[in-house]
Amino acid sequence: MSSRSRSTFLAIACFVLIDWVTKLAVLLYLGNLPDANPILYQYSWGKLLFCICPTFNEGAAFGLFAKYKYFLFFIRITIILGILAFLFLRKKTSSPAIRFSLILLCSGAIGNVGDIVFYRHVVDFISIGYKRWFFPTFNFADIFISLGTLIFIYKLYFPTKQKIK
C-alpha cells in the first residue's frame, strides 16, 4: 500500500471513529435516563443555543425519504464505493483539497451507514438554535459530509490556477 493510500485510509478511519465514538457516548449516556426526549447538555450564549439531544433519523438528510430505506442504503453504499475507488485506484494525483473533500464525504457516509447497519437508524444529537428557531439535529458525519461538499464545490468553481513558467 502506498503512503498516499495509507494516509487516506487512516484519515477516513479517524473521521469515522470520531463520529462513532461520539454517537456511542451519547447513546450510553442516554441509556441511563428515563426521559423519552432528554436534553443531555445545554449551553446558551445570549440568544444562541447549543444542545446535545439525541434524535433518530431513518431517512436521508433531515429525515427525507424515510420510506425508501433500502433504496437509500443502496445509493449510500454505491456512493461510498465510488469515492473509495476514486481515492484508491486513481493513479493521477488530484488536488489535496479535492482529495480531502472526498475523504470527508466518504467518512461521513460510512459513519451514517454504520449507524443504519448497527442501529437501524442514524443517531443525530447536535442541535443549534437562535431564539426560537432550531436547525435540524445533526451529527459529526453530517458535518463531515457538509464540509466535504462545500470544499468540493468551491474547488470546482474556483480551481487553483497553474503557474506559467
Curated annotation (Swiss-Prot):
Coiled coil: none annotated. It is found in: Cell inner membrane. The keyword Transmembrane applies. Its main location: membrane. InterPro entries: Peptidase_A8. Pathway: Protein modification; lipoprotein biosynthesis (signal peptide cleavage). The active site is at D124, D142. It is a multi-pass membrane protein. It catalyses: Release of signal peptides from bacterial membrane prolipoproteins. Hydrolyzes -Xaa-Yaa-Zaa-|-(S,diacylglyceryl)Cys-, in which Xaa is hydrophobic (preferably Leu), and Yaa (Ala or Ser) and Zaa (Gly or Ala) have small, neutral side chains. The keyword Signal does not apply. One of its GO terms (biological process) is proteolysis. It comes from the Bacteria. One of its GO terms (molecular function) is aspartic-type endopeptidase activity. The chain crosses the membrane at residues 9-29, 69-89, 98-118, 133-153. Keywords: Aspartyl protease, Cell inner membrane, Cell membrane, Hydrolase, Membrane, Protease, Transmembrane, Transmembrane helix. Its EC number is 3.4.23.36. GO terms for cellular component: plasma membrane. PANTHER family: LIPOPROTEIN SIGNAL PEPTIDASE (PTHR33695:SF1). This protein specifically catalyzes the removal of signal peptides from prolipoproteins. Belongs to the peptidase A8 family. This is Lipoprotein signal peptidase. It comes from Chlamydia abortus (strain DSM 27085 / S26/3) (Chlamydophila abortus). The lineage of its organism: Bacteria, Pseudomonadati, Chlamydiota, Chlamydiia, Chlamydiales.
